[in-house]
A protein has these predicted regions:
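Short, non-helical or kinked segments that cap or interrupt transmembrane helices
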Residues: 26-48, 88-93, 164-167, 190-191, ...
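Helix-loop-helix "hairpin" substructures at the membrane interface of multi-pass membrane proteins
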Residues: 15, 133-213, 237-243
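Transmembrane helix-bundle core of multi-pass membrane transporters
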Residues: 10, 85-86, 91-161, 188-191, ...
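Inter-helical junctions in multi-pass inner-membrane proteins, predominant
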Residues: 2-18, 158-163, 189-231, 251-264
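Cytosolic-side transmembrane-helix boundaries in multi-pass membrane proteins
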Residues: 81, 112, 172-180, 184-187, ...
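Membrane-interfacial amphipathic/re-entrant helices at transmembrane-helix boundaries
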Residues: 1-21, 50, 60-62, 89-94, ...
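Membrane-embedded helix boundary and interhelical linker motif in transport proteins
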Residues: 32-77, 81
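Short loop segments and helix-boundary regions at transmembrane helix junctions
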Residues: 31-39, 73-116, 158-165, 170, ...
Length: 289
């Protein structure tokens, strides 16, 4: 029993780590640009397939370093051509656009790489379990959690101590004032969008190494990532971090005692949080609250 419990809690933490990376990218874009990016899961898929394509040439480590920035560059192009013209308009326009874009990415990856699942080869030593008793905890699972921790730490350092991060935080509070100070708001939005898509691409590489690839894999991570933002509090990146981990662990624990409700529990959690705290657990004005 204890092994089953430990397995599901560990699995929940790992899934929660994916939710955190995805949700932080979504939250960055939403907070500054007021864009609900339904194509975020599609960019995760793009990152994974880029890693799959280049791994035979530069290895897994090279793909891990190269695929996320390449995904961010693709995101920049999409933002410049499709999303930027919709800034300042009703958010429904960008929501519908990214919703359609998600289907375009899914069909595009299916056309280029085929509908069959694709494996991404990871280093052999990462595929080994830690011990016979903890056979379900492989080195790669711990590696994924470590990468997420490093990425989240670097993101918060960027937002707290760099000029770009300070401008992003200021723009979240009052974009008009930032523009009045002579800061290029369009460039700020673009760079912020690229950071968010970078996180999606990184999530895709990590997920591909664990789960393999298929064109629809981003869809399964997208809605829980939105729920993580809502539970943690819209506008709060620390809240998004906590929300992602909470729903991951809750899903894992529920799988032990009530397997049929393991997916539904995150929606129940969202409903309870909204009833008790409509702004979420940490929701306040401003993204670093």
């Amino acid at each position: 029993m204890w092994q089953l419990l430990l397995f599901n809690v560990t699995n929940g933490l790992i899934i929660g780590a994916f939710y955190v990376l995805m949700a932080l990218g979504l939250s960055l874009i939403l907070n500054l640009s007021n864009v609900i990016n339904f194509a975020h899961g599609g960019f995760l898929v793009i990152g994974g397939y880029i890693a799959y394509t280049i791994t035979p040439y530069i290895g897994f480590w090279g793909a891990l370093l190269l695929a996320p920035p390449l995904t961010a560059i693709i995101g920049l192009l999409v933002e410049r051509v499709l999303i930027r013209p919709l800034y300042g308009r009703d958010p429904l326009y960008s929501l519908l656009l990214t919703f359609g874009l998600a289907f375009m990415i899914e069909d595009g990856t299916r056309f280029i790489w085929g509908p069959q699942g694709k494996p991404v080869t990871i280093p052999a030593f990462l595929a080994q379990p830690l011990s016979n008793d903890l056979f379900f905890i492989t080195g790669y699972r711990l590696f994924m959690v470590a990468v997420v921790m490093v990425a989240v730490t670097l993101l918060f350092l960027l937002l707290r101590y760099t000029r770009l991060g300070i401008r992003i935080r200021a723009g979240t509070l009052d974009l008009e004032t930032v523009a009045a100070l002579g800061i290029n708001v369009q460039m700020l939005r673009s760079l912020n969008f690229a950071v968010g898509i970078f996180l999606a691409g990184l999530s895709g590489v990590l997920a591909a190494g664990q789960l393999g690839l298929e064109p629809t894999m981003g869809t399964g991570l997208l809605m829980p990532s939105f729920i993580a933002i809502i539970v943690g509090g819209i506008g709060s990146l620390p809240g998004t971090l906590v929300g992602g981990l909470l729903i991951g662990v809750a899903s894992g624990l529920t799988a032990v005692f009530l397997p049929a409700a393991s997916e539904a529990v995150i929606y129940v959690m969202m409903a309870v949080v909204l009833l008790l705290r409509p702004r979420g657990l940490f929701g306040e004005e401003g993204m670093m609250s």
